[in-house]
Regions:
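Aromatic sugar-binding surface patches on proteins
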Residues: 86-97
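Bacterial signal peptide processing site
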Residues: 19-21
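Middle-to-C-terminal accessory/interaction subdomains
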Residues: 186, 194-196, 200, 334-401, ...
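Proline-enriched interdomain boundary motifs that mark the N-terminal boundary
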Residues: 28-37
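Extracellular acidic, Ser/Thr/Pro-rich low-complexity tracts
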Residues: 55-59
Length: 541
């Protein structure tokens, strides 16, 4: 591409450099030397700069102009965009363009090289200028250029963030892109978050803005999450999973997300995913907001947001004896995420525990298949089908652990599956889910083993998968888009962080299986496993 551009420019210069009455080719003056007007040229990130130069024989014509380094190769970080003829004969301006790679560079061995128009010699040779310097400080302290938006967080007094419970006062601003708007500085609080992920070197964070803001076109809210994706060599497991979940029309809401760079207290921390927090809100999980007075009748029936998580770290939690989990066998751990623990009344807790118990007892009872007396009177079946498909297509075994699994119930309504969350641990990996090569990952997860014993449920599940398949088959193209979008971010991120350190939290074994691969090889593997899932799943339904 670079070479062909130079040839076109050179062809234009042949006409520009020749006299009006062209001499025979054999009599053309020959370029014998090239002089540059400056020994140093600074280019701003993403910009260009002009370097004037002259040729000794002002009537000389030439075929090609390019930039060459001492080794004879063309530079990667910048290129020759165009040549503009000067006012005087034999004078020109070279427009040199930054390649947009986001790198610092400082080359002092750059030459303008001209291929003369001299058919009398059978060999191509370039006449080169003396060496000159081209430099750019793409990443001065506290800045980064990868093509992604940059989130800047500065804590009060430069304090460190060491707790998942205690907030630190801070300010936040965003440098946008052509696609995404930026944000002027606003006040916020920030703390750590996550279970296992909090104990890795690259930390995830929760941000609480003082005032609701719309970030990157997502609905206004105060609370936002910065996922570190530390162990994900592809940097796209969560991104792709949320894309798949957004295709599911029976899931009420899927968190919006945008990959960003994080600069914390002036230090670039790497590639992050800014994502909406799973939280009850008119623009997120839209169940009825409760008060401590909602204790009887229809008022006590909702809304609730529940998390199923074997880590058992919710403040209000219990285990229902029915169902299957991958950690200890029987029983499902439930936690109440909404109402907040300080607002949840004993009557409300008794109601939702009773509803879960009645649902599970019916599901595991003799009449569970009955369309009127069975499980269908308690759960929104379509949402449970779509939720399972997302986990199964992505090979996410967390549904069966269970971990970061959500359900919600609105006032007067049934139990609804979702939203989807936290798809970085073992997703699309044969390391954590070897059964994915030939079978289902979540065939027996939580309540699904029992649900699939109902032929009507299994038929609906199969029909829904086949209906969604054309959409699901577009995801590899989306992965290609993400790969292009994240390439430079990945280069900088993995110069700072080693995802193979995730083995420290997994008995010495890497989790996803691609931690020691290159970014591009890891993406190719992710895409290959995804395509295999689309082939394997239909045969097992």
């Amino acid at each position: 591409m670079k070479k062909s551009l130079c040839v076109v420019l050179g062809a234009a210069l042949v006409c520009a450099a020749c006299s009006e009455k062209e001499e025979p080719a054999g009599n053309d003056p020959v370029v014998r030397s090239v002089q540059v007007a400056s020994s140093a040229l600074e280019i701003l990130p993403g910009g260009s700069a002009v370097l004037p130069f002259t040729v000794e024989d002002k009537e000389a014509s030439f075929l090609e102009v390019k930039l060459l380094l001492d080794g004879g190769q063309e530079p990667e970080e910048f290129s020759l965009r165009e040549i503009v003829r000067g006012v005087e004969r034999g004078s020109y301006q070279a427009v040199i363009q930054d390649a947009g790679l986001g790198r610092n560079y400082d080359r002092d061995d750059v030459h303008i090289a001209i291929l003369p128009r001299s058919p009398s010699t059978g060999n191509d040779y370039y006449v080169q200028s003396s060496a000159f310097r081209v430099f750019s400080e793409a990443n001065p302290p506290g800045t980064v250029y990868t093509g992604l938006p940059v989130v800047y967080v500065d804590t009060q007094g430069g304090q460190g963030i060491y707790s998942k419970e205690e907030y630190v006062k801070a300010s936040l601003k965003i440098r946008g892109t052509e696609q995404y708007d930026g944000l002027d500085e606003v006040a916020c609080d920030i703390r750590g978050r996550g279970n296992t992920t909090w104990y890795w070197p690259k930390k995830p964070y929760l941000i609480k803005l003082d005032e609701k803001q719309s970030l990157f076109g997502m609905p206004k809210h105060k609370r936002w999450i910065l996922l570190a994706n530390f162990m994900d060599r592809t940097l796209m497991r969560n991104l792709v999973s949320m894309k798949v979940a957004s295709m599911m029309s029976h899931l009420a809401w899927t968190p919006g997300c945008v990959p960003v760079e994080l600069v914390l207290n002036g230090k670039h921390m790497g590639s992050y995913l800014l994502i909406e927090q799973v939280r009850v809100d008119k623009k997120r999980v839209t169940v009825t907001e409760m008060t401590p007075q909602d204790n009887v009748g229809d008022a006590v029936t909702g809304g609730y947001l529940l998390e199923l998580d074997f880590h058992y770290d919710n403040e209000v939690q219990w285990t229902d004896p029915n169902g299957h989990n991958n950690q200890w066998g029987n029983g499902i751990p439930f936690g109440v995420k909404y109402p907040d623990p300080e607002d949840l009344t004993p009557q409300q807790l008794a109601y939702i525990k009773g509803y879960i118990s009645e649902t599970a007892n019916t599901l595991y009872g003799n009449d569970f298949k009955d369309p009127d007396k069975g499980y269908a009177q308690y759960i929104d079946v379509d949402s449970f089908i779509d939720y399972w498909i997302v986990f199964e297509v992505m090979g996410n075994h967390e549904l069966g652990n269970p971990g970061s699994v959500y359900m919600h119930k609105d006032r007067g309504g049934k139990l609804v599956a979702g939203p989807c969350w936290d798809f970085d641990w073992g997703v699309l990996s044969y390391n954590t889910s070897p059964q994915a090569r030939t079978g289902l990952v979540n065939g027996n997860a939580i309540w699904y083993g029992r649900l699939r014993q109902d032929p009507a449920f299994e038929a609906r599940l199969k029909a829904r998968f086949n209906e969604l398949l054309p959409k699901l088959e577009t995801i590899p193209d989306y992965m290609d888009e993400c790969e292009k979008r994240l390439t430079e971010s990945a280069r900088l991120n993995f110069a700072m962080w080693n995802p193979a350190e995730d083995a420290s939290q997994n008995g010495g074994y890497i989790i996803n299986g691609d931690e020691n691969m290159s970014f591009h090889d890891a993406v190719a593997r992710l895409k290959s496993i995804y395509k295999e899932r689309l082939r394997v799943i239909p045969a097992k339904l």
